């Protein structure tokens, strides 16, 4: 029914990748992991519905995502980031929105953000949900992209290491493909301490000023599930 594709250069995040995938309530699913660093080890990751590939670290993130998506057994692709949180019903709800709205790409323009060092849960652009993207002023969060495999035949990810998700959406709009932002719930972008290599390189203090503060908590799951009633 759906293929999750994750490309990573962080061996310490592999366990989180498996946890996010295994947590999903949807039964008919598979996970494709692309190891994009030459010294990363496969370990014991292989399972019937998990496949692992290793691409040379000279390959860009965009190229890795294209390769992984082309290995998919299912016709719908979900791009998972290796360091974020996806609730048990994330895939189920994304598929429902994709079908109900009849669009090519779904995701979330408004998202929860958890600052791990401060144990602070916030909402970034909380009002940016349930709308069609019509211009290039607002984009879906890269870790929330879910799309039909056939989209990549028209619009593959470009060979970029940063901004490949934004460029993908721009290219989709140029090709008159439809993009839709779903609800805020079921996904959390996690901000780790400074030593973590974030693709979005902005100081936590600056980022927090752009967010609505929700709670200081060790466990954010109850706040972010669909119907959690936090906003």
Region spans (language model):
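The conserved acidic donor/metal-binding loop of glycosyltransferases
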Residues: 81-86
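Acidic donor-binding loop at a coil-to-helix junction in glycosyltransferase catalytic cores
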Residues: 162-168
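Short, acidic, metal-binding catalytic loop of nucleotide-sugar glycosyltransferases
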Residues: 19-28
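Conserved donor NDP-sugar-binding/catalytic core segment of glycosyltransferases
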Residues: 89-120
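Glycine-rich, basic loop-to-helix element that forms the pyrophosphate-binding segment
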Residues: 55-72
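A recurrent flexible, glycine/aromatic-enriched loop bordering the glycosyltransferase active site
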Residues: 62, 112-113, 126-147
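Short aromatic/hydrophobic "clamp" motif used to bind/position activated sugar donors
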Residues: 77
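Active-site donor/metal-binding and catalytic loop motifs
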Residues: 113, 183-219
